[in-house]
Protein backbone atom coordinates (compact mmCIF):
# COMPACT_ATOMS: atom_id res chain seq x y z
CA UNK A 1 0.00 0.00 0.00
CA UNK A 2 1.45 3.37 -1.03
CA UNK A 3 -1.29 5.43 0.57
CA UNK A 4 -0.94 7.56 3.67
CA UNK A 5 -1.47 5.28 6.69
CA UNK A 6 -3.18 6.46 9.91
CA UNK A 7 -3.54 3.19 11.86
CA UNK A 8 -2.24 -0.38 11.63
CA UNK A 9 -3.70 -3.52 13.23
CA UNK A 10 -2.80 -7.21 13.03
CA UNK A 11 -5.69 -9.68 13.33
CA UNK A 12 -5.74 -13.19 14.80
CA UNK A 13 -5.15 -14.70 11.35
CA UNK A 14 -1.98 -12.68 10.94
CA UNK A 15 -3.38 -10.33 8.31
CA UNK A 16 -2.33 -6.69 8.48
CA UNK A 17 -4.97 -3.95 8.28
CA UNK A 18 -4.11 -0.38 7.28
CA UNK A 19 -6.42 2.59 7.72
CA UNK A 20 -5.56 5.06 4.94
CA UNK A 21 -6.93 8.29 3.48
CA UNK A 22 -8.87 6.22 0.94
CA UNK A 23 -10.34 3.55 3.22
CA UNK A 24 -9.01 0.28 4.64
CA UNK A 25 -6.38 -2.00 3.08
CA UNK A 26 -5.78 -5.61 4.12
CA UNK A 27 -2.50 -7.39 3.41
CA UNK A 28 -2.55 -11.19 3.62
CA UNK A 29 1.18 -11.65 3.03
CA UNK A 30 0.85 -11.78 -0.75
CA UNK A 31 -1.50 -9.06 -1.91
CA UNK A 32 -3.50 -6.04 -0.81
CA UNK A 33 -7.28 -5.76 -0.83
CA UNK A 34 -9.08 -2.46 -0.42
CA UNK A 35 -12.34 -2.17 1.54
CA UNK A 36 -14.83 0.64 1.09
CA UNK A 37 -16.83 2.01 4.00
CA UNK A 38 -20.46 2.50 2.96
CA UNK A 39 -23.30 4.44 4.57
CA UNK A 40 -26.23 3.19 2.51
CA UNK A 41 -25.33 3.86 -1.12
CA UNK A 42 -22.76 6.53 -0.28
CA UNK A 43 -19.08 5.75 0.16
CA UNK A 44 -17.62 7.16 3.37
CA UNK A 45 -14.23 8.48 2.29
CA UNK A 46 -13.90 11.84 4.03
CA UNK A 47 -10.87 12.23 6.30
CA UNK A 48 -13.36 12.97 9.10
CA UNK A 49 -14.57 9.36 8.79
CA UNK A 50 -11.17 7.62 8.66
CA UNK A 51 -9.55 8.05 12.05
CA UNK A 52 -9.29 5.01 14.37
CA UNK A 53 -8.88 1.26 13.89
CA UNK A 54 -9.23 -1.17 16.82
CA UNK A 55 -9.41 -4.93 17.41
CA UNK A 56 -11.47 -6.08 20.39
CA UNK A 57 -10.77 -8.99 22.75
CA UNK A 58 -12.71 -11.37 20.49
CA UNK A 59 -10.65 -10.39 17.45
CA UNK A 60 -13.33 -8.23 15.80
CA UNK A 61 -12.08 -5.23 13.81
CA UNK A 62 -13.70 -1.81 14.32
CA UNK A 63 -13.27 1.46 12.43
CA UNK A 64 -14.40 4.80 13.88
CA UNK A 65 -14.42 8.33 12.48
CA UNK A 66 -14.64 11.85 13.88
CA UNK A 67 -18.18 12.17 12.50
CA UNK A 68 -19.23 9.44 14.93
CA UNK A 69 -19.72 6.58 12.48
CA UNK A 70 -18.79 3.11 13.77
CA UNK A 71 -18.03 0.26 11.35
CA UNK A 72 -17.65 -3.43 12.22
CA UNK A 73 -15.83 -5.95 10.03
CA UNK A 74 -18.14 -8.78 8.96
CA UNK A 75 -15.86 -11.78 8.41
CA UNK A 76 -18.59 -13.92 6.81
CA UNK A 77 -19.41 -11.37 4.11
CA UNK A 78 -15.87 -9.91 4.03
CA UNK A 79 -17.03 -6.30 4.33
CA UNK A 80 -17.42 -3.49 6.84
CA UNK A 81 -20.92 -2.77 8.13
CA UNK A 82 -22.09 0.54 9.58
CA UNK A 83 -23.45 -0.39 13.01
CA UNK A 84 -23.90 3.02 14.61
CA UNK A 85 -23.69 6.73 13.84
CA UNK A 86 -24.20 9.77 16.03
CA UNK A 87 -27.32 11.77 15.12
CA UNK A 88 -25.68 14.63 13.22
CA UNK A 89 -28.71 16.89 13.67
CA UNK A 90 -27.55 17.23 17.27
CA UNK A 91 -24.18 18.54 16.06
CA UNK A 92 -25.15 20.92 13.27
CA UNK A 93 -22.37 23.33 14.26
CA UNK A 94 -19.74 20.58 14.72
CA UNK A 95 -18.55 18.83 11.55
CA UNK A 96 -16.40 16.52 13.70
CA UNK A 97 -18.28 15.84 16.98
CA UNK A 98 -15.83 13.09 18.04
CA UNK A 99 -12.38 14.32 19.05
CA UNK A 100 -11.22 10.91 20.31
CA UNK A 101 -12.54 7.35 20.04
CA UNK A 102 -11.40 4.35 22.06
CA UNK A 103 -12.32 0.70 22.64
CA UNK A 104 -12.18 -0.48 26.26
CA UNK A 105 -12.06 -3.97 27.81
CA UNK A 106 -15.74 -3.85 28.80
CA UNK A 107 -17.06 -4.00 25.22
CA UNK A 108 -17.64 -0.26 25.03
CA UNK A 109 -16.56 2.13 22.30
CA UNK A 110 -16.00 5.60 23.73
CA UNK A 111 -16.94 8.48 21.42
CA UNK A 112 -15.56 11.54 23.18
CA UNK A 113 -15.79 15.28 22.86
CA UNK A 114 -15.23 18.13 25.28
CA UNK A 115 -18.78 18.01 26.67
CA UNK A 116 -20.00 14.42 26.32
CA UNK A 117 -18.81 10.82 26.15
CA UNK A 118 -21.03 8.45 24.18
CA UNK A 119 -20.56 4.81 25.21
CA UNK A 120 -21.57 2.35 22.48
CA UNK A 121 -21.96 -1.21 23.80
CA UNK A 122 -20.72 -3.56 21.08
CA UNK A 123 -22.85 -6.43 22.45
CA UNK A 124 -26.19 -4.74 23.12
CA UNK A 125 -25.74 -1.90 20.59
CA UNK A 126 -27.09 0.47 23.24
CA UNK A 127 -25.62 3.96 23.64
CA UNK A 128 -25.18 5.73 26.98
CA UNK A 129 -24.55 9.47 27.24
CA UNK A 130 -22.09 10.52 29.95
CA UNK A 131 -21.19 14.08 30.86
CA UNK A 132 -17.51 14.83 30.37
CA UNK A 133 -16.77 16.51 33.70
CA UNK A 134 -13.12 16.86 32.74
CA UNK A 135 -14.23 19.58 30.27
CA UNK A 136 -11.06 19.04 28.26
CA UNK A 137 -10.44 17.35 24.93
CA UNK A 138 -9.44 13.73 25.58
CA UNK A 139 -6.38 12.52 23.68
CA UNK A 140 -5.84 9.00 25.11
CA UNK A 141 -7.24 6.58 27.70
CA UNK A 142 -5.75 3.59 29.53
CA UNK A 143 -7.83 1.12 31.53
CA UNK A 144 -6.57 0.09 34.97
CA UNK A 145 -9.29 -2.36 35.99
CA UNK A 146 -13.01 -2.93 35.43
CA UNK A 147 -14.01 0.63 36.30
CA UNK A 148 -10.88 2.80 36.73
CA UNK A 149 -9.11 4.73 33.98
CA UNK A 150 -6.25 7.11 33.30
CA UNK A 151 -7.45 9.81 30.92
CA UNK A 152 -4.98 12.01 29.01
CA UNK A 153 -6.08 15.37 27.61
CA UNK A 154 -4.64 18.40 25.86
CA UNK A 155 -4.03 19.91 29.30
CA UNK A 156 -2.81 17.00 31.43
CA UNK A 157 -3.88 13.68 32.90
CA UNK A 158 -6.70 12.54 35.18
CA UNK A 159 -7.65 9.50 37.24
CA UNK A 160 -11.33 8.54 36.95
CA UNK A 161 -13.91 5.90 37.76
CA UNK A 162 -16.78 4.93 35.47
CA UNK A 163 -19.69 3.75 37.59
CA UNK A 164 -23.50 3.87 37.24
CA UNK A 165 -23.22 5.67 33.91
CA UNK A 166 -21.21 8.52 35.42
CA UNK A 167 -17.54 9.42 35.13
CA UNK A 168 -16.23 10.38 38.55
CA UNK A 169 -12.89 12.18 38.82
CA UNK A 170 -10.68 10.96 41.66
CA UNK A 171 -8.24 13.42 43.16
CA UNK A 172 -4.60 12.52 42.59
CA UNK A 173 -2.26 15.40 43.39
CA UNK A 174 0.78 13.91 41.67
CA UNK A 175 -1.06 13.28 38.40
CA UNK A 176 -2.85 16.63 38.51
CA UNK A 177 0.57 18.29 38.72
CA UNK A 178 1.44 17.00 35.24
CA UNK A 179 0.68 19.96 32.98
CA UNK A 180 1.33 18.86 29.43
CA UNK A 181 -0.45 17.91 26.23
CA UNK A 182 -0.70 14.12 26.44
CA UNK A 183 -0.10 12.31 23.15
CA UNK A 184 0.03 8.66 24.26
CA UNK A 185 -0.38 6.54 27.40
CA UNK A 186 0.78 3.02 28.23
CA UNK A 187 -0.20 1.29 31.48
CA UNK A 188 1.61 -1.87 32.55
CA UNK A 189 -0.75 -3.73 34.88
CA UNK A 190 1.97 -6.08 36.10
CA UNK A 191 4.21 -3.37 37.53
CA UNK A 192 1.40 -0.78 37.92
CA UNK A 193 3.22 2.00 36.12
CA UNK A 194 1.78 4.52 33.68
CA UNK A 195 4.08 5.79 30.93
CA UNK A 196 3.07 9.24 29.73
CA UNK A 197 4.09 10.54 26.31
CA UNK A 198 3.65 14.26 25.65
CA UNK A 199 3.94 16.92 22.99
CA UNK A 200 7.42 18.48 23.35
CA UNK A 201 7.53 17.79 27.10
CA UNK A 202 9.11 14.35 26.92
CA UNK A 203 8.22 11.24 28.89
CA UNK A 204 7.00 10.92 32.46
CA UNK A 205 6.15 7.83 34.51
CA UNK A 206 3.50 7.58 37.22
CA UNK A 207 4.22 4.76 39.68
CA UNK A 208 0.99 3.63 41.39
CA UNK A 209 3.00 1.72 43.99
CA UNK A 210 4.79 4.80 45.32
CA UNK A 211 2.23 7.35 44.07
CA UNK A 212 5.02 9.39 42.51
CA UNK A 213 5.79 10.91 39.11
CA UNK A 214 9.25 10.14 37.71
CA UNK A 215 10.93 12.21 35.03
CA UNK A 216 13.84 10.25 33.50
CA UNK A 217 17.13 12.17 33.24
CA UNK A 218 17.10 11.77 29.47
CA UNK A 219 13.41 12.00 28.65
CA UNK A 220 13.23 13.25 25.04
CA UNK A 221 11.75 16.52 26.27
CA UNK A 222 12.23 18.39 22.98
CA UNK A 223 10.57 15.66 20.90
CA UNK A 224 6.91 14.77 20.51
CA UNK A 225 6.07 11.22 21.56
CA UNK A 226 3.62 9.48 19.21
CA UNK A 227 3.34 5.90 20.50
CA UNK A 228 4.48 3.38 23.12
CA UNK A 229 4.67 -0.31 22.19
CA UNK A 230 5.89 -3.19 24.40
CA UNK A 231 9.16 -4.70 23.17
CA UNK A 232 9.50 -7.33 25.90
CA UNK A 233 8.77 -7.75 29.63
CA UNK A 234 11.28 -5.07 30.57
CA UNK A 235 11.28 -2.54 27.73
CA UNK A 236 8.95 -0.30 25.75
CA UNK A 237 9.52 1.01 22.25
CA UNK A 238 8.95 4.75 21.87
CA UNK A 239 7.94 6.15 18.48
CA UNK A 240 8.59 9.88 18.08
CA UNK A 241 7.69 12.60 15.61
CA UNK A 242 10.98 13.19 13.82
CA UNK A 243 13.32 11.69 16.42
CA UNK A 244 13.34 8.03 15.40
CA UNK A 245 12.46 5.08 17.63
CA UNK A 246 13.84 4.76 21.17
CA UNK A 247 13.35 2.24 23.95
CA UNK A 248 12.93 2.67 27.69
CA UNK A 249 13.75 0.23 30.48
CA UNK A 250 10.61 0.08 32.64
CA UNK A 251 12.62 -0.52 35.83
CA UNK A 252 15.55 1.91 35.47
CA UNK A 253 13.85 4.40 33.07
CA UNK A 254 16.99 4.49 30.93
CA UNK A 255 16.13 5.65 27.40
CA UNK A 256 18.37 4.76 24.45
CA UNK A 257 17.97 5.06 20.66
CA UNK A 258 16.68 1.92 18.97
CA UNK A 259 16.23 2.99 15.33
CA UNK A 260 17.51 6.29 13.94
CA UNK A 261 18.21 7.42 10.38
CA UNK A 262 21.47 8.93 9.18
CA UNK A 263 21.71 11.59 6.47
CA UNK A 264 22.08 8.98 3.73
CA UNK A 265 18.57 7.77 4.62
CA UNK A 266 19.85 4.45 5.92
CA UNK A 267 18.93 3.02 9.29
CA UNK A 268 21.39 2.76 12.17
Regions inferred by a protein language model and the residue ranges of each:
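Carboxylate-rich, polar loop motifs that coordinate divalent cations or form catalytic acidic clusters
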Residues: 1-268
Amino acid sequence: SNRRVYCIQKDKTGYMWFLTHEGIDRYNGKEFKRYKLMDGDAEVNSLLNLNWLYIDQEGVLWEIGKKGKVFRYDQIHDCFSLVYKLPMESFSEQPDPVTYAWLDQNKHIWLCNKDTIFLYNTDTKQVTHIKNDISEEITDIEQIDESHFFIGTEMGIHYAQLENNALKLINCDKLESVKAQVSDLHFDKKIRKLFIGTFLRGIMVYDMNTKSVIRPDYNLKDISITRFKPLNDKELLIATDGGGVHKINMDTYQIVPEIVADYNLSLI
